Every structure is written in structure tokens, then in C-alpha cells.
Amino acid sequence: MLGDGKEGTSTIPGFNQIQFEGFYRFIDQGLIEELSKFPKIEDIDHEIEFQLFVETYQLVEPLIKERDAVYESLTYSSELYVSAGLIWKTSRNMQEQRIFIGNIPLMNSLGTSIVNGIYRIVINQILQSPGIYYQSELDHNGISVYTGTIISDWGGRLELEIDKKARIWARVSRKQKISILVLSSAMGSNLREILENVCYPEIFLSFLTDKEKKKIGSKENAILEFYQQFSCVGGDPIFSESLCKELQKKFFHQRCELGRIGRRNINWRLNLNIPQNNIFLLPRDILAAADHLIGMKFGMGTLDDMNHLKNKRIRSVADLLQDQLGLALARLENVVKGTISGAIRHKLIPTPQNLVTSTPLTTTYESFFGLHPLSQVLDRTNPLTQIVHGRKLSYLGPGGLTGRTANFRIRDIHPSHYGRICPIDTSEGINVGLIGSLSIHARIGDWGSLESPFYELFEKSKKARIRMLFLSPSQDEYYMIAAGNSLALNRGIQEEQAVPARYRQEFLTIAWEEVHLRSIFPFQYFSIGASLIPFIEHNDANRALMSSNMQRQAVPLSRSEKCIVGTGLERQVALDSGVPAIAEHEGKILYTDTEKIIFSGNGDTLSIPLIMYQRSNKNTCMHQKPQVRRGKCIKKGQILADGAATVGGELALGKNILVAYMPWEGYNFEDAVLISECLVYGDIYTSFHIRKYEIQTHVTTQGPERITKEIPHLEGRLLRNLDKNGIVMLGSWVETGDILVGKLTPQVAKESSYAPEDRLLRAILGIQVSTSKETCLKLPIGGRGRVIDVRWVQKKGGSSYNPEIIRVYISQKREIKVGDKVAGRHGNKGIISKILPRQDMPYLQDGRPVDMVFNPLGVPSRMNVGQIFECSLGLAGSLLDRHYRIAPFDERYEQEASRKLVFSELYEASKQTANPWVFEPEYPGKSRIFDGRTGDPFEQPVIIGKPYILKLIHQVDDKIHGRSSGHYALVTQQPLRGRSKQGGQRVGEMEVWALEGFGVAHILQEMLTYKSDHIRARQEVLGTTIVGGTIPKPDDAPESFRLLVRELRSLALELNHFLVSEKNFQINRKEV
């Protein structure tokens, strides 16, 4: 429980702070801890000893910059050097050298790592904390069975259970169980020590039979009995040293290593005082656990709630990186042992430098960042996405749960999540509730627990002296914590007498005098995504969840705009995302253009390079625009350049546009959206997308591949954009099918393909004629655009394993179009159904046409009323030229506070602009509007306003797909599935029913056979369709029917088919 130095003040912590703290903990503690575990290594004859001197380790600053590492596809890492000594025991000589152990990827200012030029982030994992947990469940007779589960640091489990005769068993696996007396004896206790150390010796004596006495007569007997049960070995095994080692390795190391967290938890739960450095399970722990289990059976003690956060721990970046370092050093130990024995065998004199290789450490970290489930590619769709990704918490991953096995109780919200894990922000689908998001003020404590801050209120005044504390989930159970209207930002506001509070997982109403702690901030319980939703208190939680997910999918627009109605967190999100360029100290601007800003300060002249049209991994465009003029004096922390989706250092994901909630000719049925052509021609929702196309050159068996402009058999039109080297020129406009990189792959032609005169010449002159196949990089369908960058990455060596890579970056300008997805900040999403001319759109009483028409039926059933408040307040803000930043739950000040604020602002706007239609008392917030086609007013008044609408990354250009013919699956001979594989549509059950309903038998037969999986017929269909002939009817079965026949044959069922002519069919029917 830690206090903050300043009394009564709190600031929002940096949103990347958790990642930084984790990495700092690894560098400061974890690195030394793992290096100090590295053992002294001796040779077989015990003549040479190798050891590391940990105190002198050194991490060297990287030689390359972050930006160069991304550009050249390298890893941004630091070299680790440690002093190592080699001691000759006979002569007592020691040779000490500073050796290079390997590279450790560093964390950059965004809280991410750059591995092979790709931004990667390690997310935090929630695991069951090591310790002991007591639970009860009903058996088939309805009787409670009590169990105590000991969870080790590795996740291994040992279960203690008590049966109806009060006998205690240790369950080693699902099938095997042994008596607790045998387990204690195998761990080194004799019967007298067992009985002295338990509270209920008579119960232990009650199940001590003669057979049991024989088993625990000596430690050897107990170990043999335990080994038999654990390894399921028949017969009579013989006690040996190797048997003990196997048991130690397979059982005690995996299931009995508690770690420091487990030791602390077991000491606390069982009231023991075993030293913290004793991290293995002791016989004393087993006996104390058995005593507690007996107490449980007789109604003493409390059961554990496995889903409470006090029984969970966070496995942070530090723990994961430390585990990988331990793994790498274990591999290094084996390498050193092998090298020492090899050197002695070949009579070579080893040196520390020769014994150690950097491969184990470097490859371990590269494979960790590349393959581990908790190391993910950073999602960089927009600035918000980058920050939110680093604050995720996952129950999945190694040692955790899976989406299929996790039950509903684990996924559900728990009262202990309050202020630590956001109750709203989680993924949708199979992982719902398993991937959460950290609350704004939560932090990870030293013991892996999630801590949340509170103000401590002192008894006398409850206001005068206030101190901030960080409490873990096990600590805040014992305090009355005020919530609700005690969250007043201004402490001068008179607190009410009765306040809602939380105590021991329950929500109560208590007197203000009884409160011990109070929350520090209205947003304290929410994640960043949920905290950016204005009026979130008026929305259903499901819609708030969708909104916090959809804000992460918003595309940065070419001209961004601040939201009129926000929550006040927009600035902090933008600053912490690292997207805007910020002045590190004060100075004066000397020069500025689109590529760099030069300013002088502290006697130095600094040049800040700006990001120019950089591609994110979601193909969005990252670009910085300078915001300062030449000659201007700037202060430390001032914004020098805005990035993608930021304006004036504030997050700006969408646009404030004029919206009407009304039906319009059915074009906004089922969440469809009607928009005005102004949004297209005015470039309101225009965004830039950058696609990357790459090609590699290999050295084949016939020779190296060549990059060239001279490509035979191709039209000159397709090669028009290539330079003399065969690579597309910068700035050229390319269309589908154009060649981006010309490449020839050598191949030797078959003898039969040569003309007779060629063969004669080859026989006489001995010339080997080589032909080449064109393997050019062509622009695929939908890729048209402007070439903005070409990178030729030449790897060292140039072998076939390190091929040269050429990357071409093409920028596309995309206006909004029919089929694109748009969304508000309240889970109100829709697809553009029609783009109307501006003169046909409904228009306001001052003649302005609206930009977008939403369906009003999308509001009541979904209970996201916050959008109506935002819509009306946005209209008032645009007329008054004001921006609003509203904290959630403003009803804590007075009832209907949101409605009063909106109406008062609308009233003021109508007064100041002399437009009475802005606020009409008969139907406040609504206005009469006119049909643009006829000029007649609509029957009912309509809600109009200016909400903040986002354009999402689900765009029709990436989804629309057509195919005439393409690839087929080998087994079924049916078209492949999906756009990426150039797949076809599947006519499924329901589609067949629809066609049957219309009675189109011939079309149905064509779809299911000729056009689908009849190999010969589908080729004929294509030909006859082109020339306009009739489709020939095949007389054999399609491939899927033949597949069915083969599968039946595999079950020894023969199926014959033959043709029955119509004539014979009639005769046979008469005979029947």
C-alpha cells in the first residue's frame, strides 16, 4: 500500500507507463537475477572452470536509429557484454575477458520493440497465482467434497482431497492418488514429525493401517510407493539414485516449485512463517494444508473465489523476457560444456571468447518476438490503436486458458475488477471476456497484482487532509470505498449524507462518515477506449463495447477535425501515442518544410525529421504536418507537427457532420446510411492508403534470377513505367496488370522443345541454350495508384538464403463510396447505401442540406441514447463555435444534468444566431426540415445535429471480389474460398432452397455441376459462354459425386450407377 507524496492531487499516468516499467524492471533486476543463476562449468577432469562475473555486465547503445531499423528490416537491439573467467585449477591461473553474449531487443519510446523491421508489442497475461486454493463441489450423491489445490509457479497442480471417512489423499493425476502420509514421508518426514506438526493427529492416526505403516516405514519405501503410483509402474521397482532423480525432475520440480509469489501466498493463507527464499513446497506446507482441509470439512475457514483478482497475478513484459533469458542461458550452458570437452579432446587451449557464442541468446529472443502468442504485431491503424494494444490483458497464452475451455464465470465481470480491469472494453466473439483492457489508473505491483489508486479520508474533517494510496485487490476488501456522487471533481461541493460504497465485494449505501476511501477520478474504472465516449452513462454496455472497439478501426483522414463534444482525454491519448512531434526544450524555429523542422535551443541547432507518407501495417497512411512558422519562439512540450489523426495535439479520428435521424425511401433500412455527394466531392471522408508489394531474387540451380527491363513476349505498354534497371520509377501512376519489377528466372528447356536446326547446332558447337521464364511483380486487381517509394534491400552475403528484396509502395486516394462502413462513438454503425445529389438531400430551415441520414429505429431498441445528446450538443457547439469536454456520469451533480446542459446550449445558440428553429420548446432538439426533391416539409419534426462520425477500415475496395474462373481444390475440384485465394462463391443449402423456390431447375443444375466441379464440362461452359453457343450436357458424374463414391468404397460399400433410358424406364415401371 503506497502513498503519493502530494496530498489530494493526482494526474493521469502515461498510457505507455506499464510497458516502460516492465522493461525497466527486466533490465534493472531480471537481467542480473538470471545471469547470477548461471553456474560454474567444469570439464570432466575438473581441471578447468568457466564462470561469469555478473556485476560487470554492460548493455551497449544501438548503432542504428529506430527509423533506419524499420527501413532496412533490422532489429533495434542492444549488445550484452559480460566479463567471463577461465580458471586452471592446477596452476591457479585465471584468464578474464569481456565477452559478447548476444543481442537483446530494446523498447522504444512507444513501448514497443522493432524486430526485423516490424513493430511488435508484448501484452500482459493474467494467470492463476501460485499458492493454495480451497474449493468444494457436490459429488453424485449431493454431498460436498472439499479439495485444496496447490498451484506451482510453472502451473503444475497437486490436489489434496478429503473423503467421507475423513481420509486425506493427494491426487497426483486424474486417475492416481496416494495417501498424504506417503507423500509426506517421501518428502522426508517420519511419522513422529508428521503427528507433532498437525492440529488433528487423531484423524491422521485413524487411517493409519498396518499396510500404510509398512509403506511409510522408511523414506525409501515411501519413495518407491510414490514412484509406483506417480509413474504407473507395475511390479516391484528397486530404490536407486536415478529413480530419485527422475521423481525430482518429473514431479517435485514441476509441481512443487512455488516461486517467491507462491511462497508469500501460502504463508499468508496457512499462517506460516517460512522464509521467503524457501521457494519449494515443504512437508510443513502439506501438513498445514491438510489441517486447513480438515477444518473446512467441519465448517471452519472460508472457501476461495478463484476468479477474484487477489488470486490472479499479472505476467508482465519483465517476467516473459526474464523467462526467455533463462532459457537462452540454459542453452548457452550446454554450448559451453560441449566446447570445453571438444577443446580438451583436440588438445586446444580454450579462452572465454572461444567458448561463448552469441547465437543462443539472439535466436531465443528473435523466436520469442516472432512466434510467442503474447508477442503480437503492433496494430497501427490510428494513434488510439497503438496505445490500447499495449494495455491489453489476456487470459490466453502459454499456461493460461483457451477460447474453447474457458467457462462463463471466468469471462464475467467480477467486483474485484473495479478500477483495475475495464468492465466494458473486451473483444467480441470467442474471446469475449478473455482479452480485457487495463483501467486508466491501474498499475502492476511488485508481486504481480493489479493496483488501483484511492484517496484516504481522515476521520476528523473528511476533507482537510487527503492522501492517495495504491491498493491491491486483497487490501481494498477491508475498506469502505465510496463511489457514485462522492466522485465530485470539486471537493468544495457538499457531499450528501448517504453515499453508495463498495465493501467486501458488495455494493452498499452508507453514511458519509463511515467512508474510509474514495475514488480519485470519474474515468477510473474505464479503459482508454471507453473513456473517449461522451455521455457513456446513457448507453447500453454492449454498444459501449462496440464503440470502444470501433474507434480502434477508424481510418486517419486526409483532413482531420477535432470533435466538438469530447471527454477531455483526447489530448493525453495523442501525446502518449508518439504521433505528434513535440519540442523537447524551448528555442526558436530557424527553418521548416514538409520534411524537417530546424530550431535552435540551449546553444544547439537541432533538426527534427518528419514522417512522410509512412505505411502502417494496416495500410493506413502515417504523415506529419508542421504546425509552427519560421521565426516563432517555442516552449518545451509544444506541438511542432501534427501526426495522422491528430489536430493541435488532440486525437481527431473522424468529422463533425450534419446528420438527420429520419427514414428516407427505405435507403436507411437495417442500419444502412444515406449520404450527400458533398462528402465525396469535398474530400470530407477521403483517406490515403499505402500498399506494399515485394519480390525476392533467389539463386536457383540454373543460375541467379535477374532484375531487368528486357522482358520478352510482354507488351511495351505494361513495361512503360520501368527504369533502365527494371524497377518502377518513383512518382509514376500504375494500373492493374502493370509490371512493377521486371524479373527473369533461368530455366533449361526440354530437348523436345527445340527446333531440329537448334539441336544440330548444339550438337556441333556444344552450346547450352538457356531460356528464361518471366516472374515479374505485377500490380494485382484493385492496386492502382501512385508509386511513392521503392526500396531495394540487399542482405549481406547475397546467398539464396539471404535473397535481395525489392519493395514497392503505392499510395491510393480513397473517397467514401457505397459499401464503406461508417460509425459514431456509441456503437451506431452502418454501411453507405446510396450517395444522393446535394439538391435531393433534406435541408434545414436556413437552407443547409444535411450530410448524412441515419435510421431513427436504430436508437430505442439498442438503448444507446448518448448519440442523441452528442448530436444536439454538437449542433449547439458548431453554431456557438465552442468545444465541449464532458466527464462521464455528470448526473452525480444533479438529476438530468446531461439534458439540462444540452437544452441550455441549444437555447443559447438559437438566441445568439437568431434562429428560433434551433430550439423549439414544443419539441426541443428537433426541427422541421424539408424534402430536397419537392421542397415540402416532412410530416414530423426530426432530430438534427452534428455528431462525430468515423470512417472505418472495413472498406468496400478491400472486400469486393469477382471471379470468372480460378483455382480449384484438389480433392473436391470445387472453387477455393476467399478473396485472397481468388476464390468463388459457394452455393450452399439455403441458396439451393431459394433457387428451388423459384423452380429454376436448369440454372440450379448448372450451378451445382457444370460451373462447379465437373472438370470437363466447366471448360466447355466457359468456351460456349464466350462464343454464345448452347451449353453441352455431359453424360458422366461431377467430381463431388465421384468423391462420395470413393469415400463409400473406403467403407467397403460399392455403388454402381448406370443410365436408364426413358423407354426402358416406362417398361420396367409397368412390370413393377
UniProtKB/Swiss-Prot annotation:
Its main location: plastid. It catalyses: RNA(n) + a ribonucleoside 5'-triphosphate = RNA(n+1) + diphosphate. One of its GO terms (biological process) is DNA-templated transcription. One of its GO terms (molecular function) is DNA-directed RNA polymerase activity. It is an enzyme of class 2 (transferase). It is found in: Plastid, Chloroplast. Pfam families: RNA_pol_Rpb2_2 (PF04561), RNA_pol_Rpb2_3 (PF04565), RNA_pol_Rpb2_6 (PF00562), RNA_pol_Rpb2_7 (PF04560). InterPro entries: DNA-dir_RNA_pol_bsu_ext_1_sf (IPR042107), DNA-dir_RNA_pol_su2 (IPR015712), DNA-dir_RNAP_su2_dom (IPR007120), DNA-dir_RNAP_su2_hyb_sf (IPR037033), RNA_pol_bsu_bac (IPR010243), RNA_pol_bsu_CS (IPR007121), RNA_pol_Rpb2_2 (IPR007642), RNA_pol_Rpb2_2_sf (IPR037034). Keywords: Chloroplast, DNA-directed RNA polymerase, Nucleotidyltransferase, Plastid, Transcription, Transferase. The keyword Chloroplast applies. NCBIfam families: PRK00405.1. DNA-dependent RNA polymerase catalyzes the transcription of DNA into RNA using the four ribonucleoside triphosphates as substrates. Belongs to the RNA polymerase beta chain family. This is DNA-directed RNA polymerase subunit beta. It comes from Lepidium virginicum.
